[in-house]
């Protein structure tokens, strides 16, 4: 079991119970899932780019990504409906906790010119979204084998009812928010 999951059960639940005066432990917000999305718009011209992006996402998450397809045709971007334009992975359970642990302790500190994550990236319902400009911050990616630096979106979905609860949950995990 991931250390972060044990830490959540032992420390974070108690801390949030006292902070928000919950009656039951089931009211305490928890991390539901983490979604990693990598948009590869250049895949229209070269299908190999999408395969490389999928391989990177597999290395980062430990799970085979789902290839996302265009929902509708857009002439300006030269895409048609059904064209493969990206890939995504949804992490739950043990893999989710392990990824969150690696993200907080290893990947985020390796971001170039890092001054903290924005605390304003909550959606109003306690879910947090962040963008990463380079996939090479993850230790699983071999820098020499990278064909192109790609970014990815990371969405942390929680059971929190408000942004304050979601922010308190992630802050309890020592998320490096900007002051």
Curated annotation (Swiss-Prot):
PROSITE patterns documented for this protein: RIBOSOMAL_L5
Cellular component terms (Gene Ontology): ribonucleoprotein complex; ribosome
BP GO annotations: translation
Alphabetical list of Pfam families matching this protein: Ribosomal_L5, Ribosomal_L5_C
The organism's place on the tree of life at top rank: Bacteria
NCBIfam families found in the cross-reference section: PRK00010.1
Sequence similarity: Belongs to the universal ribosomal protein uL5 family.
UniProt name for this protein: Large ribosomal subunit protein uL5
Organism: Pectobacterium atrosepticum (strain SCRI 1043 / ATCC BAA-672)
Gene label: rplE
């Amino acid at each position: 079991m991931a250390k972060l999951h044990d830490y959540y059960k032992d420390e974070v639940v108690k801390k949030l119970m006292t902070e928000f005066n919950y009656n039951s432990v089931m009211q305490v917000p928890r991390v539901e899932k983490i979604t990693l999305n990598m948009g590869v718009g250049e895949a229209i011209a070269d299908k190999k780019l999408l395969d490389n992006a999928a391989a990177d996402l597999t290395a980062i998450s430990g799970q085979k990504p789902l290839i996302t397809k265009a929902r509708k045709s857009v002439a300006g971007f030269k895409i048609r409906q059904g064209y493969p334009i990206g890939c995504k992975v949804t992490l739950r359970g043990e893999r989710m906790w392990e990824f969150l642990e690696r993200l907080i302790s290893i990947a985020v500190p390796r971001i170039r010119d890092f001054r903290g994550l924005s605390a304003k990236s909550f959606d109003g319902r306690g879910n947090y979204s962040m963008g990463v400009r380079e996939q090479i911050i993850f230790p699983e990616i071999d820098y020499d084998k990278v064909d192109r630096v790609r970014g990815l979106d990371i969405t942390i979905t929680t059971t929190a009812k408000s942004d304050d609860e979601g922010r308190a949950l992630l802050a309890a995990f020592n998320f490096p928010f900007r002051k």
